[in-house]
From Swiss-Prot:
Disulfide-bonded cysteines: none
Lineage, opening ranks: Bacteria, Pseudomonadati, Pseudomonadota, Gammaproteobacteria, Pasteurellales
Protein name in UniProt: Replication restart protein PriC
UniProt similarity note: Belongs to the PriC family.
Domain of life according to the entry: Bacteria
Keyword Magnesium: no
UniProt xrefs under Pfam families: PriC
Natural source organism: Haemophilus influenzae (strain ATCC 51907 / DSM 11121 / KW20 / Rd)
Keyword line: DNA replication, DNA-binding, Primosome
Subunit comment: Monomer. Component of the replication restart primosome, which is composed of PriA, PriB, PriC, DnaB and DnaT; DnaG primase associates transiently with this complex. Interacts with the C-terminus of SSB; this interaction is required to load the main replicative helicase onto substrate replication forks. Interacts with helicase DnaB alone and in the DnaB-DnaC complex, probably 1:1 binding with DnaB.
DNA-binding in keyword set: yes
Gene (name only): priC
Function of the protein: Involved in the restart of stalled replication forks, which reloads the DnaB replicative helicase on sites other than the origin of replication. Recognizes abandoned replication forks and remodels DNA single-stranded binding protein (SSB) on ssDNA to uncover a loading site for DnaB. There are several restart pathways, the PriA-PriC pathway is a minor restart pathway. Part of the minor PriC-Rep pathway for restart of stalled replication forks, which has a different substrate specificity than PriA. Part of the major restart pathway with PriA, PriB, DnaB, DnaT and DnaG primase.
Length: 195
């Protein structure tokens, strides 16, 4: 298959996706997407269709003799299309659930970490900090490697968001560590006084 044929097939796929979900453009999607596919979660359908179109445009404007570049972007585009379609199908089949129940479940899972004992919570914070560090480095590297200015800016902005979140996580770790040291000192003092 030539590059031109590949682009035509991908263009058809994107057009089919647009036609299938044209009426749902303003619907919000609450699925969590892989950050390598979409830049944000919780956006409306038109946002994701726009990002799919940006990937298609990148393929159309790509000037490379290496077929791996085209394959990589084509696979990304197809993955974007399929996860968006799956999310829309899932959303439409689960419309019978009440939204308040869903919101309560999300809120409970977000706050469940705060109900853990301090030492277990600290472990979760360490894991989160490590993940945020990795995401920061990954997006910083992507920003440096990216040729397209818009994409470079987007990756740099995402890297900054991860850096700020990492700093908040570090602040929470510091505070929790201080608390645990303080608690240990108080317990040691009480133990020596009781002897």
């Amino acid at each position: 298959m030539t590059v031109q044929q590949l682009i035509q097939r991908l263009d058809q796929k994107v057009q089919q996706l647009y036609q299938a979900h044209l009426s749902k453009r303003e619907e919000k999607i609450f699925a969590k997407f892989d950050r390598t596919l979409f830049s944000e979660n919780g956006q409306n359908v038109s946002f994701y269709l726009k990002e799919i179109n940006q990937t298609l445009d990148r393929i159309k404007t790509l000037e490379s003799n290496d077929s791996n570049h085209y394959n990589f972007l084509a696979e990304r585009l197809l993955a974007q299309c399929s996860v968006l379609s799956e999310a829309l199908v899932r959303k439409n089949t689960h419309l019978t659930e009440s939204q308040t129940t869903t919101k309560q479940t999300i809120q409970k899972s977000q706050h469940s970490i705060h109900k853990l004992p301090p030492r277990e919570r600290l472990e979760k914070y360490y894991e989160a900090r490590e993940q945020l560090n990795n995401l920061y480095r990954q997006h910083k590297d992507l920003a440096q490697a990216e040729k397209n200015n818009d994409e470079k800016i987007r990756y740099a902005q995402l890297a900054e968001v991860y850096k700020k979140r990492q700093q908040k996580c570090q602040d929470a770790i510091d505070l929790l560590e201080e608390y645990l040291v303080f608690k240990e000192e108080v317990e040691n003092r009480e133990n020596t006084e009781n002897k």
